[in-house]
């Protein structure tokens, strides 16, 4: 019986996984090889690519979840900022509406619509008019401060000027009454005024005053009639022990 050219292949490699290769014949010169197989199922297995790994897909999905979370935070911050801006605008509109109530119809007519800038300008103009009517301008207030505090306030910017103005009238008579250094006085001065500045005269006057205070007069309460009677009846103590 003739021996076949190719050894019979086992069918176990057909049911093996896609990554496992069929067993190669031991004879290298054999013309039978898996590449020569005409089985279409075997060719489909060799040409089909390996299935992609699932792990990279999960990694790719992670940045998407982070991006979604960050977008939610950004939208929340934008919404809170818009809410704060709306609240600020409502507060400003309410304050300007309250200011509009204090403006008289002659300044702001009742049916006239005013913008925020126009309302502020009219209010400033009306306040300036009231200050002029009541005498509360800066010049009047400065005069009142000088009249109340002639010495000047240390916190006021014009305190030095006010102090110099207040001290000027006080010093002017003394300056006018004085004479130049080289010329003699126009009228003779009294001698008492000259003696009052003499040191010897001052010392003598002070000594006389002290002497008068040390010598009480009989009319003083220390030397009343009862005190004089006691002094007359008083006798000096005798020596002890007696001789």
From Swiss-Prot:
Motif CPLCP per record, residues: 153-157
PROSITE patterns (alphabetical): BHLH
Disruption phenotype: Mice embryos exhibit defects in single heart tube formation, due to a delay in mesodermal migration. However, the cells eventually acquired migratory activity and gave rise to an abnormal heart tube. Mice lacking Mesp1 and Mesp2 die around 9.5 dpc. The major defect is the apparent lack of any mesodermal layer between endoderm and ectoderm and a defect in the migratory activity of mesodermal cells. It seems that a compensatory mechanism exists in which Mesp1 expression is up-regulated in the absence of Mesp2. Mesp1 may be involved in the rescue of somitogenesis in the null Mesp2 embryos.
Gene responsible for this protein: Mesp1
Gene Ontology CC terms, in alphabetical order: nucleoplasm; nucleus
Subcellular location: Nucleus
Function: Transcription factor. Plays a role in the epithelialization of somitic mesoderm and in the development of cardiac mesoderm. Defines the rostrocaudal patterning of the somites by participating in distinct Notch pathways.
Biased composition regions of type Polar residues, renumbered to the chain: 27-36
Gene Ontology molecular function, alphabetical: cis-regulatory region sequence-specific DNA binding; DNA-binding transcription activator activity, RNA polymerase II-specific; DNA-binding transcription factor activity; protein dimerization activity; RNA polymerase II cis-regulatory region sequence-specific DNA binding
Keywords: Developmental protein, DNA-binding, Notch signaling pathway, Nucleus, Repeat, Transcription, Transcription regulation
One protein family per Pfam: HLH
Tissue: No expression was detected in adult tissues except the testis. Expression in the testis was regulated developmentally; expressed 2 weeks after birth, and increases, reaching the full expression level in mature testes.
Inducing factors: Expression is induced by Notch signaling.
Phylogenetic classification of the source organism: Eukaryota, Metazoa, Chordata, Craniata, Vertebrata
Gene3D superfamilies (alphabetical): Helix-loop-helix DNA-binding domain
InterPro entries (alphabetical): bHLH_dom, HLH_DNA-bd_sf, Mesogenin/MesP
GO biological process, one term: heart looping
Superkingdom, natural source: Eukaryota
Protein's name according to its UniProt entry: Mesoderm posterior protein 1
């Amino acid at each position: 019986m003739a021996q076949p050219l190719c050894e019979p292949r086992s069918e176990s490699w057909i049911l093996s996984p896609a990554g496992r290769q069929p067993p190669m014949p031991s004879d290298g010169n054999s013309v039978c090889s898996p590449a020569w197989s005409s089985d279409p199922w075997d060719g489909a297995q060799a040409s089909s690519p390996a299935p992609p790994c699932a792990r990279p897909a999960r990694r790719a999905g992670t940045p998407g979840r982070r991006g979604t979370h960050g977008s939610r935070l950004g939208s929340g911050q934008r919404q809170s900022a818009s809410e704060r801006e709306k609240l600020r605008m409502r507060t400003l509109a309410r304050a300007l509406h309250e200011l509009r109530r204090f403006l008289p119809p002659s300044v702001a007519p009742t049916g006239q619509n005013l913008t925020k800038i126009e309302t502020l300008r009219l209010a400033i103009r009306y306040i300036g008019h009231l200050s002029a009517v009541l005498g509360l301008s800066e010049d009047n207030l400065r005069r009142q401060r000088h009249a109340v505090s002639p010495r000047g306030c240390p916190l006021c910017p014009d305190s030095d000027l006010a102090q110099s103005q207040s001290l000027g009238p006080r010093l002017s008579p003394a300056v006018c009454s004085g004479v130049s250094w080289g010329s003699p006085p126009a009228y003779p001065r009294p001698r008492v005024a000259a003696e009052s500045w003499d040191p010897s005269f001052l010392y003598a006057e002070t000594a006389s005053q002290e002497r008068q205070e040390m010598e009480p007069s009989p009319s003083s309460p220390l030397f009343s009639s009862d005190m004089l009677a006691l002094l007359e009846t008083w006798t000096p103590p005798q020596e002890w022990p007696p001789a």
